[in-house]
Amino acid sequence: MNASPLECDYLVIGAGATALAFVDTLLSESAEATVLIVDRHHRPGGHWNDAYPFVRLHQPSEWYGVASRELSHGSKDTHGFNAGLYGLASGVEVLAYFDQVMQQRFLPSGRVRWLPMSEYAAGTNGAHRVTSLIGGDAQSVTVRKKVVNATHAQTAVPSTHGPKYTVADGTNCVPLNRLPQVGRPHAACTVVGSGKTGMDAILWLLENGVAPSRIRWIMPRDAWMLNRANLQPGIENFERNMGSAVDQFEAIAKASSVPDLFARLEQREQLLRIDEAVQPTTYRCATVAPGELAQLRRIADIVRLGRVRGIEPDRIVLQHGSIAADPDTLYIDCSASAIVMPPALPVFDRDRINLLMVRTCQPLFSAALIAWVESHVADPAAQNALCAVVPSPEHPIDWLRMWAVTLANGARWRQHAGLQAWLMQCRLNAIAVYMRGVKPDDTVRLALVRQSGIMAGAAAAALPTLLTAARLNETGQPA
């Protein structure tokens, strides 16, 4: 049966982190806008609802979440592989946080309606349809302004995406979510997947007493990773944070080639890799603490024969060969691609807003900034000029491509006084977090800020040459 029709200014598809960051800033910057949020999950948080039970943020809690509400407790970890660095919120904490955002801010505003366990279907001429996944009722929705697509940055997790390889009967293969439920020791543990979930699986096994000699790691691709120690809040970390930016910009400005760029970045500990003898072929914005990296490097049995094709009781079949396996092996599937590549779309697309990244590796900040632009900038061309899309990462060269757009966007933001004022007070803006506690008369730290700006300009000037060389190299022509 059809329920009563609904009306709203903005229909937001999805209630994940980027959607909530957008809505939060929209409520703050627009006095009257009404919002309808539609999501297939039973509570806000998107993929966090499906994540493994021991999942944690991979970045400091200080600049995660929505702009209006703190998530961080402002304390450092005193034990574990992240010891000495600021805390990483657990999945339970993140879900509780987003539930509080919905229940204590969005719904009490009277301007937000939330339809959980519901599915959106596109309509025409401003008419859209939402169907309850439980009750089956369908409601038409009239959208007065725009539809906001918060599903482009879909995050695939093992619990919702099964393995793409065959698993023979009698073989014990579990998704990462079920790892804490394994009730007995196994002769060996094999982690399938080299992304951040694979790293988390390795670290969990080590934390829970599995000897490194009993762990095998199927690593289809080695990755470059960001150094979490360079991304820390707190005034005591100001010099390292700003110095990190200077190091990255200087590496871009002085690099004679793309290989030279990555050599400089690694030498300055801006990018890290598991094995210094193996050249990484991917980059996905994964962040790792030095303590975690030291633990990951304890795994000696790393298999680099491509992706798994099949698991049999006594062997693993891969793209480039087969290897013997102990029949009493526990296989942990971490092969789901954490980042799903979004389509090539502008952020502002007539009557639609696509929540895509506008700063490297910062989707939540990007969503909040897009909401600010929607609230304060009327011209579509001007909106998209402020929100050029940063490509999602896949290959190492994407580190450079992401910075190219990020620096260009930043230059345009600095020309907009209103946006610049918002940026400097937004808790999702890591730069604003870094600047907390820096006094106007702190000449030493302010000089470092100016140096960062100068080197950013030098990097922006050098980027086209490096990217051109990379493109020529990809086509087989001299670089």
Residue spans for each PLM region:
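Feature captures the FAD/FMN-dependent oxidoreductase FAD-binding
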Residues: 78-157, 275-278, 285, 292-318, ...
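Short hydrophobic core segments
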Residues: 11-13, 140-155, 190-192, 326-337
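Glycine-enriched catalytic-core subsegment of oxygenase/oxidase enzymes
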Residues: 203, 302-444
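Extreme N-terminal leader/targeting segments of oxidoreductases
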Residues: 1-10, 28-33, 141, 153-180, ...
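Rossmann-like dinucleotide/flavin-binding elements
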Residues: 19-29, 178-226, 365-416
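C-terminal catalytic lobe of FAD-dependent flavoproteins
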Residues: 268-269, 273-341, 435-479
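Glycine-rich active-site loop/strand segments that organize a redox cofactor
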Residues: 40-97, 218-275
